């Protein structure tokens, strides 16, 4: 058994702290049940000295958001020469930047929505494109800060320039693609099943509450799609995973407009949530793998120089 002592890194100081704690706790429980010695580490600025003291065989990265999935913690682990799960420094940093990741993925022939990167203050002055469109913080996850500008809104959005905006000034603005929402996970070099997401009717879109509250969304896996579209989602997910340079696991999100036949890649997640309501465990189950199988596979796959 590789990595008998596993340090599960969780928590941290990002806006996704609670998600990370839930993911990390669930993964730590599984690893302990499978015979690993587990150290549960709530990450802070002293993480390097903590890891030097613990001397784990493997670091399981259950962090989400800045520092956890943007190449920072990966760089610390490379410096300490501790094998770790998920993607490496370069792929993590690139995937976290939604705009630049989209440029790279589009370069290998994956269809993406028209978009631009700009200052939130410029967005607040005038529409950057014809509504409807979506505004997202450039480097956040879990749908934090997402603003949907509807078709008939004449004035540009003001909530991106007010004091309530707690994210970076740079945002990505992309054309809103109506239709069905899908996600597909990649494990190693294999695209797993495609899952369709139905947010509860109380939510405008698949936002934070829809993702993490019990009953907030319905996951249909495998998705009911024509074989051609299903295979295209899998192909595009694997292409994005490889173009970004991901290792271990990733999950790509899509929109499909049945009226026009348009299938669009939205973004990639190099640290898919592993909470009880997360998509990745559901996809793994549909593919014939248990939650525990996936978590143990990640530990066995851990390495440096990723």
From Swiss-Prot:
The record's gene field reads ddl
In the record, the note on similarity to other proteins reads:
Belongs to the D-alanine--D-alanine ligase family.
* Keywords noted in UniProt: ATP-binding, Cell shape, Cell wall biogenesis/degradation, Cytoplasm, Ligase, Magnesium, Manganese, Metal-binding, Nucleotide-binding, Peptidoglycan synthesis
Q: What does this protein do?
A: Cell wall formation.
Q: InterPro entries, from UniProt?
A: ATP-grasp (IPR011761), ATP_grasp_subdomain_1 (IPR013815), D-Ala_lig_Van_CS (IPR000291), D_ala_D_ala (IPR005905), Dala_Dala_lig_C (IPR011095), Dala_Dala_lig_N (IPR011127), PreATP-grasp_dom_sf (IPR016185)
Positions binding Mg(2+) 2 in this chain are 267, 269
Q: Provide the E.C. number(s) assigned to this enzyme.
A: 6.3.2.4
Under the GO molecular function aspect, what terms does this record hold? ATP binding; D-alanine-D-alanine ligase activity; metal ion binding
Localization, UniProt: Cytoplasm
Its pathway is: Cell wall biogenesis; peptidoglycan biosynthesis
Do you know which HAMAP family this protein is assigned to?
Dala_Dala_lig
Annotated catalysed reactions? 2 D-alanine + ATP = D-alanyl-D-alanine + ADP + phosphate + H(+)
Q: What is the protein's given name?
A: D-alanine--D-alanine ligase
Q: Which residues form the ATP-grasp domain?
A: 102-300
What's the short name of a Pfam family annotated to this entry? Dala_Dala_lig_N
Task: Name the PROSITE patterns on file.
Answer: ATP_GRASP, DALA_DALA_LIGASE_1, DALA_DALA_LIGASE_2
Residues bound to ATP: 128-183
One GO biological process term is:
cell wall organization
What Gene Ontology cellular component terms go with this record?
Answer: cytoplasm
Top-level taxon of origin: Bacteria
Residues the entry annotates as binding Mg(2+) 1: 253, 267
Cofactor requirements of the protein: Mg(2+); Mn(2+)
